[in-house]
Amino acid sequence: MAVLVSLACLHMVPAHAQSTAPRNAHAALPEVVVSGSRQEQAADELPLSYDVINANTLSNQQSRNLREALENLPNTSVKRSPARFSVGGATASAGRDGNVGINIRGLGGNRVLLMTDGVRMPRSYAFRTTTFDREYLSLELLKRIEVVRGPASALYGSDGMAGLVNFITHEPADFLAVGKGETPKTLGGRIAAGWSGDDNGHTLAGTVAGQASDTLQWMLTATTRGAHAMDNMGTNHEPNLNRTRPNPQDDRDNAVLGKIVLRPHATQRHVFTLEHVQKKSDVDLLSSRNPLPLRGTPAQIAGAIVDEYSSRSMERNRLTWDARFGLGTDWADHLRTVVAYQDAQSRQVGTSVRNTLPLRVRDNSYGESTWQAGVQADKILRSGGWAHKITYGLDHVRSDISNLYTGLAPLPPEVFPLKRFPDTRETTSALYVQDESVHGNWSLTPGLRFDHFSLDVTSQAGFYPPAKQPGQSLSGSALSPKIGVLYRATEQWSVFGQYAAGFRAPDAGQVNGYYENAAEQVIIIPNPDLRPEKSRGVELGVRGRLDRLSLDAAVFGSHYSNLIMDTVLIRGTGTAADPRIFQTINTERARITGFELKGQYDWGRVAGGRLVTPFSYGKARGVNRATGKPINSVDPAQLALGVQYDTAAWGLRLDMRHHAAKTAKD
């Protein structure tokens, strides 16, 4: 059992943000989301489970990273590995990948689709002790975070098997808006600064936005953050394997977001976006050093680590043109086109100084360059008392994926430079359609998407040889249906249900990954016969919007087939004559079930301020249906409970989180 209590959110509130009238659950404007249906829609009209975290919440919670932003959501978590990258020594198997990915309802990593303004973010990549995470973002650039729990492939395709998270960035209008009767702004912005004691981190961000004319708005945001190692309760400061204090660490994050919004006509809107995110971390791995004086066999003394240090860097650049047209034709009321180019590069460099053996260096990199294009139309039709909003379109995504391993003193029989998998182009083309039908208090939303995907090797250079066989290409297709139902029982209560299918195509590293280590008698071989993972999910839920209480509750169950398991031992005893052979394989079926609830209670005005209690609880359990064993990626139950007090000038928030123990049956 673990309990975490934080008193982290003493914040200043602008005077105009405080209402003097009593507020209930409906006082604010209805929350609008785009991720649940690919259209702007009132969140409570969605027949599925969702979460929206807006910029005010991120600021008031003083969230510094993705883990902190999502930590109060039910059945949602972010894995953190604070030790970062290392080369050898005792920390070789320790985590070194930062906030590696989001887990939704028991599955995470690349099974959760991450997007920024609807553009797919890079995948994570892991191979043995090298891991590249997915946190290519800065929270200071975000207007809100939208989370959809459950399969999302019917609208977004591969990787949306467990759910999706869409990071939506600010626009100029967010800083130029004025109240009723006030003079319109031609210039606006904000400045934000922060400090955190647990990692001695500091943040500075600034935004300036302007209205150049009636048809043109612009915005520029820049942010920087510096931090050191996360503090802990360790007491041993020794610079060797016995150390329990954090290793010295220096983190630097920088990000820039620029936008131009052009409205040449009342029925047109064009948004041009430039986003740049850069992160770097340097670690002095004192905990890898061998204690002095050196002891052991002559070979152990020769290879003893006397110094070790590493660096990790990542950079993402994005250009997007997002255009919307009002048509009013027989086939479409509106048309949206998106063209985006994104380049992401990650690099990890580690250096081990050994006692008498040669210097060991590992310089590993991973990159994705992606073109994404989409066309989407919608049309409202009426028939027999039903109103239909038809949304249909096509998506095309092409990613060139590369990796490179180089350095000094490779393990035999490897010779640097080399590639763990060949240069690969992943391509996906898809058609989708959705019909949101409304009749009285009922809403019915069926949808269907067809994806064709291919994984094509573009170059064998650096991979074959030394690999025993050339990399193989792979292709396939998937059909992802869904249907959702929403019934508005009263003005305060509604119930909903959804069935949705999802899938995830195997990636380049899983299909063609190769590794050989003669000293350990280990070989990892490719598997060009991998099949896509598939999921089928059902959920039932209820929503209540009362004067004081806001409540969402849902039960869910998902069935998975062809789950891909990385580096599974398939044969071998670990001798020179019979080395251990590992391979990424498809496994049997699995099932994850659970329930969740969230909401808040508004106590009203207390001593001149407003007192609110937010809460959430989630519990899930997963079983491998072939072996009967639990699925370890499913988190134990978590309860989050808070108290938030806001006045016109300042606010105070107390959060408590309780994590149940992970038992053998879990």
What are these regions (language model features)?
Residues 31, 66-69, 100-103, 115, ...:
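N-terminal periplasmic accessory domains that precede
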Residues 67, 71-120:
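Extracytoplasmic beta-strand/coil segments of soluble accessory domains associated
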Residues 102, 120-151:
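Short acidic/polar hinge/loop motifs at secondary-structure boundaries
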Residues 173, 187, 194-203, 207-310, ...:
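Periplasmic-side early beta-strands and strand-to-turn transitions of outer-membrane beta-barrels
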Residues 193, 227, 333-350, 488, ...:
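Membrane-embedded beta-barrel scaffold of Gram-negative outer-membrane proteins
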Residues 247-249, 267-330, 344-368, 411, ...:
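Flexible loop and strand-edge segments within Gram-negative outer membrane beta-barrel domains
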Residues 387-389, 395-397, 422-558, 609-616, ...:
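Structural signature of Gram-negative outer-membrane beta-barrels, strongest in the C-terminal barrel
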Residues 438-444, 453, 550, 555-564, ...:
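Gram-negative outer-membrane beta-barrel transporters
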